[in-house]
Regions:
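Nucleic-acid-interacting cores, centered on viral/eukaryotic replication and modification enzymes
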Residues: 129
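N-terminal, motif-rich segments that launch catalysis or mediate targeting to/interaction with membranes
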Residues: 1-117, 132-224
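Short alpha-helix carrying the canonical HExxH Zn2+-binding catalytic motif
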Residues: 115-126
Length: 224
């Protein structure tokens, strides 16, 4: 995963509203790195094992921008997009329902944590879409194929997830695209929270057109 100090990003800070809402947003963004990593620790991941696959309806990794075995590409793509914007919208809703920093959820944790967890799930999904073991992209970065977890070995999958960085520790082309897409998603979240819906919609459209666009959805394998 690519971690970004979202709370220190100049654009994000400039977009934040004053006083209490600004403080809460900065706290949410500061919690993101751990929230993104923790997204991978779920019961659904149990289905990635041969034993667990018999009892759960889908592969756990399919919740992270991947396909179930035999799933049409169009359906896998739609599910992946929903895993990006569904949690992002949930994060907006949770933030808007929050009275103050100390407002507790039923899990006795701050609702700030709930917002970060939802937003972290969205970031996790968009970042997974830039792993070649999750998604095959063309030279421009357009999505060509959503990969199926059941077709892969664990070691190969893990190696692909680390391909955002080269041997010298620098971002690869995919890594740079991933970082740009992550920042754009965070911009979308902030703009939605501060009720700048027109600007947020422009961010969403750019994210879809530039970073989450299928290369040719009319070709074979992408039929409904």
């Amino acid at each position: 995963m690519i971690t970004i100090d979202a709370a220190s990003d100049p654009w994000l800070r400039a977009a934040l509203p004053p006083r209490d809402a600004r403080r809460r947003l900065l706290k949410v963004l500061s919690k993101l790195p751990s929230a993104v990593v923790d997204t991978d620790i779920t019961l659904e991941q149990f289905s990635d094992t041969g034993f667990g696959h018999k009892f759960l309806g889908q592969d756990g990794q399919a919740t992270h921008f991947m396909a179930n075995k035999g799933q049409p590409q169009r359906g896998a793509y739609a599910a992946g997009i929903d895993k990006v914007f569904g949690p992002a919208e949930r994060a907006v809703q949770l933030f808007n329902e929050m009275a103050d920093d100390s407002d507790l959820s039923t899990r006795t944790t701050s609702r700030l944590d709930d917002v970060s967890i939802a937003l972290g799930a969205a970031v996790n999904a968009v970042q997974d879409s830039f792993s070649p073991t999750h998604v095959q992209r063309d030279q421009r970065g357009d999505i060509m194929r959503i990969q199926a977890w059941r077709d892969q070995l664990g070691k190969d999958h893990n190696a692909g997830d680390r391909s955002w960085q080269d041997g010298g520790g620098n971002l690869t082309k995919l890594g740079r695209l991933c970082m740009e897409a992550t920042i754009l998603l965070l911009q979308y979240f902030v703009l939605r929270v501060v009720n700048k819906d027109a600007d947020a919609e422009r961010c969403r459209r750019k994210l879809m057109k530039v970073y989450l666009h299928p290369a040719d959805p009319s070709r074979s394998g992408w039929s409904p």
